[in-house]
Amino acid sequence: MHISPDQLIFWEYGFVKLNGTIIYTWLLMLLLAVGSKTITKRLSRGEERSRWQNLLEVIIITIQKQISEVGLRQPRTYLPFLGTLFVFVAVANLFAVFPGYEPPTGSLSTTVALAICVFVAVPFYGIREQGLRRYLQSYLKPVPLLLPFNILGEFTRTLALAVRLFGNMMSGTMILAIMLIITPFIFPVVMGVLHLLIGGVQAYIFSILATVYIAAATSDNGENAGASDDEGGEDAKSACAAGGKICKHKP
């Protein structure tokens, strides 16, 4: 067992190396791409749906609900990115149950790459939702004096995302390796199950933090509140019309 998949070298020529991080990441991407294509190949748009499709829809609805609870009003817009992020990290961590497999999330290069994806996605969604000018103005809040700190915060939280995931996965691997040396029979099984649990939790935390960062970049309290009030008024009018009652709406 290696502390990091970077230590596992499959092929080397000069300064070019194919280590475990690269190989396992490619295999995971291939597996997820083929698996997604296979799973969604026979989905139906009609009323008759298989149990498998019902299960998939429940999972998607649950993820969308989780995204909307964080503060994103249109979860379908962000589901492809956030869902892919969660699935990749979760599968990468949970596959540690297979012998000979080294999770690529145990490498700092992988976690940094994932954090950079979030770093790029935050301003992308923020600018698309609010426009370039309004998004840039958010860095001047609450006072323009905090502009350098707001910019620095973008980089520090990206670094924190990468280091948090890397540290938790690497520490779990180290503890499991130590326990295999000290007690090579019973205790490593317990630690292996705990390591899988930690891997799933870390995937959830990573994706939730990414959701929070995107929600903060796309939020506009005043505009959202106004939209919510308008929607509430329309719903109330519709309810009154359906009930045949006359309602008086206060401004």
Swiss-Prot record:
Residues 224-251 are annotated as: Disordered. It comes from the Bacteria. Keywords: ATP synthesis, Cell inner membrane, Cell membrane, CF(0), Hydrogen ion transport, Ion transport, Membrane, Transmembrane, Transmembrane helix, Transport. One of its GO terms (molecular function) is proton-transporting ATP synthase activity, rotational mechanism. This is ATP synthase subunit a. It holds the Pfam family ATP-synt_A. It is a multi-pass membrane protein. The chain crosses the membrane at residues 14-34, 78-98, 107-127, 174-194, 196-216. Belongs to the ATPase A chain family. InterPro entries: Alt_ATP_synth_F0_Asu, ATP_syn_F0_a_bact/chloroplast, ATP_synth_F0_asu, ATP_synth_F0_asu_AS, F0_ATP_A_sf. F-type ATPases have 2 components, CF(1) - the catalytic core - and CF(0) - the membrane proton channel. CF(1) has five subunits: alpha(3), beta(3), gamma(1), delta(1), epsilon(1). CF(0) has three main subunits: a(1), b(2) and c(9-12). The alpha and beta chains form an alternating ring which encloses part of the gamma chain. CF(1) is attached to CF(0) by a central stalk formed by the gamma and epsilon chains, while a peripheral stalk is formed by the delta and b chains. Key component of the proton channel; it plays a direct role in the translocation of protons across the membrane. One of its GO terms (cellular component) is proton-transporting ATP synthase complex. PROSITE patterns: ATPASE_A (PS00449). It comes from Nitrosospira multiformis (strain ATCC 25196 / NCIMB 11849 / C 71). GO terms for biological process: proton motive force-driven plasma membrane ATP synthesis. SUPFAM superfamilies: F1F0 ATP synthase subunit A.
